[in-house]
Structure formats: C-alpha cells, structure tokens
Amino acid sequence: MSSTTPKRSEPADEDMEVEVKRSKVETDPKSTQRKYEDFKAQMVTLANQLKIDLKVKHNADIIGSIVMAACTGNAIRETGKYSFFFNDEKDGWKLREVELNCKPVIDWANQTLTDEQKREWYPFLASLQLCVKTEDAILWQRNPVTRELQVSPVCEPFATGYNIKDKLKKSRPLSVGPLNHLLHWVNLQTEKSVGKGRKLSPRAAAGIRKRLEATLMRQTIGQSQKAMLRQIFDGKLAYVRTLAHSYCSIKPHIENQFVLPYSVIAVTDSFENADMSSEWVYKKLCEASKKILLTGPNESWKTFMAQMLIYCTFRCLHEDLGVLTSMFGMVFEPRKSKGKYCKSSELQVLGSQEITYKFWSKPQRGAPRNLGGARRGQICTRPSFRGVRATYNQYSSLEQLEKACGNPTSENVVEALNAEFEDTQNSPLKAQGRSTKGGLPMSTKATSRLQASFCLKFSLICVCNFCCFLSLLLGIC
C-alpha cells in the first residue's frame, strides 16, 4: 500500500520572506560536477529497480522529475505508478505502467539537503528546473503571466521561468523574467495567501514586496522604465501594460545559465570540469545526442524534438532563430509548424539525431541593450548567447508598439521612454562578448570576420511576414 511522505519542514513564512538570505557563492570548482554526479546517481538508483532504459528521453524525464520533486521537498508517494517505455522483442518500444519505489531517493534527499545544504543546492536545482521546464513552455504555450497581467503575449519572453517552484525562483531571481516578479507583486496588493489556505502576515507580505521591488529595479535598465516602476510601486497599476511592452525594445536584465537536461544527464558518463557557461556544455550535449532516443507524436517531430534539447540546454526558446541556425547548422523549425502536441500515452520512440555546432558563445548575462526583434521576422526576441549582432528594432516609439499590441498607452508619461527607444534604434550593432569557432578561441581579426558573417547569416535567414505577429506567442518562430 502506497503512502505519502510529508514535506520536509520549512522555515516559517515570516522568517523565510523577511530575512531572505543570499545563496552561498560556490567557490569550489568541483561543486557543479558533484551535483550532476549526485543527481544522476539518484536517477540510476530509481531506474535500476525495473531496468528502465534511461536512454529513452521520456523515461529520463519522468525519473529526473521524481528526483527533482524529492530534492525540493514535494510530497511524493513512496510507491507510485508511472508509465515508461520498455523494449519488447516482439512489439518494439511500448509504454507500460509500473510501480516504482521512490523511498530511497526521498531518504537521500532528506539526509542530503539540510537547511545549510539547500543554499548550495537550490541555485543548481533552480537552473536545472528552468532548463527542463523550457520544454513545457514551448510545447503548450499557455502564456499565463501575460494573460494575467492583461498584456500582449508578445511580452512572454520576459516572463521566462513562470513554471518553476517559488522557492527556486528566490534562489535565481535574476534568471527569472521580470514579468513574473511584477505579477507576484501585483497579486500581493489584493491577495495575501501563499496557497492551501495559508495566509501571509502583514510583515511577511511587506518583506516579499521589498524583495520583489529590489529585484525588479535591478532587472530594469532604462531610467524612464525605473521611474515607471516607482509609479507602479506607489499603486498606479495602469502603468503595468506600458512597462511590459517597453521591455520589447529596452530589454531587461535576465541572467542565463547553460544546464544539461535530465535526458543528457542520464547518458553522460563523465562530468569532469562541469560548469554552466563554457564549451563543455556544447560538447556534452553533442555527445549525448548520439545516445538519446527521442520521443514525440510521430517521425515528423524528430528534428524538432532534437532541437528541443538545444532550447532546454541553453534556455534559448526566445533566441533569434537565425542565430541558432548559424550556430548549430540546421534550420530551426517554428513551433506553429508542428501543430498540437500529443498526450503522453500517444508518444512514440523516434530514435536518435546527432547535434553538432559550428561555433559557440557564452551565456548572455547582462541586459542586451540594442537588440530589438527582426523587422521582418520574430516579433520579439530575448538573446541567450553573447555576441555581436545586428539590431532591427520593430518600433521607433512606444505608441507604435502599443498600437500593434492593441493596448493604448495608459497616460501621456512616455516621452522619456520614446527617447530611449530612439537611442536604441540608432545603434545597429551591439557587442556582447565573443563567439568562438570550433574548440579554440580565435584572434580578434578572426572573431570579427566570424561576427560579420554571423550577423549577415541571421539577418538573411530571419525573413518572414510581419502579419504573423499575433500567432508568435513565445518568439520561437
């Protein structure tokens, strides 16, 4: 008989929110390596019980999500029923429901993730969950944040991370889109609940608001945008739409990390020298792609599901598709071309597809100031990779942006924003670091040639009709 393991004790809301402590800076170069190794070890422990093949992406995703749930204190059953693919000699790969004993992983998490260890583990787990939840955001395109804020879905690139746990959002606040923090702040104005009937005390609510306000001010780089934020904090919520749409041109600060998803972790033999920013990540993804058996509705989805590994690893779901095409040497398919995704029970094993890269770049960490959406391509992009690229600003004023989005400017207080829009538009190129070819850094001259070629390639590739604007919900088009 299955039983539910209670969640590990958490600090009181008031203490947790008012006295938020910074995550411990990891100075140990082996820290990321050990976390990958420990996480994989727990995946293997679960899979070995029933000889579940972790090369199958669906299997690895289910096992990985169980380990993640145990690590983050979710109430999961010690014995639960899950569906995995098993290879039958007669019928090939078939889904079969089995009972899995999760208690060993639950016990490991309870012993390992003490309050002290959470400060070291939660930033890693937050980055990992941001990575794997990217797939849900792409496949289902629910856009809950923009819908609740009542702004155009064109702003969804700045709501990234909406679907990860709140306790993990606090560990990587600058990696979560500012619209998430803004929605949380707005909701606190009318609702003091933290779920399941629990109410926040006034002191705890004030602590949360203060933390959210500080994060939003750090992520917002335009001075006029900051002034608008102060107006919102004073209760003038009519400015929310205007601020959200201004992010489409004056991009906010959203930090990115490169993280291996569950399916790549499962088939990686060595995590030596692991990090979240170098060519190591590219190499491990390419090596793993030869082993991973992709799953999807049918064979026509195979290339798209291979590209899904890229989207998740580099969190580049809102990146310019021309940039991705230049980097990985394959044409990236728009989400709208694939139609509706299927139920888990209708998945098929599609086999493997090798991923290669022509050059690599480090993750984008600062705010990409001079990067608008391509005028004839994606309505709005959010760069994930550092590098020089051309800018094709979609709009020359906030009024044009809001007119296209169907939202009138709340009040006539956007002159400063329009001036910043103009400054942004007048800068055709913006350096954000170096792109690197093959495996070794190149000379400045070689890098410049690559950057010029890089800009030309994606400028030519990103050509499609502007009238598809309303259908481009997530910028993956």
UniProtKB/Swiss-Prot annotation:
The keyword Ribonucleoprotein belongs to this UniProt entry's keyword annotation: yes
CC per GO annotation: helical viral capsid; host cell; ribonucleoprotein complex; viral nucleocapsid
Protein's UniProt keywords contain Ribonucleoprotein: yes
Region (Disordered): 1-32
Main location: virion
Location in the cell: Virion
Keywords: Capsid protein, Helical capsid protein, Ribonucleoprotein, Viral nucleoprotein, Viral penetration into host nucleus, Virion, Virus entry into host cell
Signal peptide bounds: none
Biased composition (Basic and acidic residues): 18-32
GO aspect biological process, one term: symbiont entry into host cell
Domain of life where this protein originates: Viruses
Family: Belongs to the influenza viruses nucleoprotein family.
Protein name: Nucleoprotein
Species per Swiss-Prot/TrEMBL record: Dhori virus (strain Indian/1313/61) (Dho)
Gene name per UniProt: P5
